[in-house]
UniProtKB/Swiss-Prot annotation:
This is Protein SNORC. One of its GO terms (cellular component) is membrane. One of its GO terms (biological process) is cartilage development. PANTHER family: PROTEIN SNORC. Coiled coil: none annotated. It is a single-pass membrane protein. The gene is Snorc. Keywords: Cytoplasm, Extracellular matrix, Membrane, Secreted, Signal, Transmembrane, Transmembrane helix. It comes from the Eukaryota.
Length: 121
């Protein structure tokens, strides 16, 4: 009975250590297609349309039309999209490692509570 319980505890501890190691292992090397790499689908099924035409020249002479000052959100540079094929940054890796360590601590606490409960009875 005691050896069976010790075996179960050992298996729980080993799985608590191995599961985070497997979860934080490096993923596949092939980049998966992501949403920002996919072409925009047009609902009509036609080819892409150009929003600006380089062939048109405007014959408007005179001062340009007055425009308002750019709003603060317009002056913010656009966020750079990571083109590394889905690699995780250091913050994401740190968050995964911390979550794995917390999960291991929870499993270890459950094992300790179970051992105390069964040893008391």
């Amino acid at each position: 009975m005691a050896s069976c319980l010790a075996l179960r505890v050992a298996l729980l501890l080993i799985s608590g250590v191995l599961a985070p190691a497997v979860l934080t292992a490096e993923g596949p090397q092939e980049p998966d297609p992501t949403l920002w790499n996919e072409p925009i689908e047009l609902p009509s099924g036609e080819g892409p349309l150009e929003s600006t035409s380089h062939n048109q020249e405007f014959a408007v002479s005179g001062p340009p039309f007055p425009t308002s000052a750019p709003a603060p959100e317009d002056s913010t540079p656009p966020a750079r999209v990571d083109q590394d094929g889905g690699s995780l940054g250091p913050g994401a890796i740190a968050a995964i490692v911390i979550a794995a360590l917390l999960a291991t601590c929870v499993v270890l606490a459950l094992v300790v509570v179970a051992l105390r409960k069964f040893s008391a009875s």
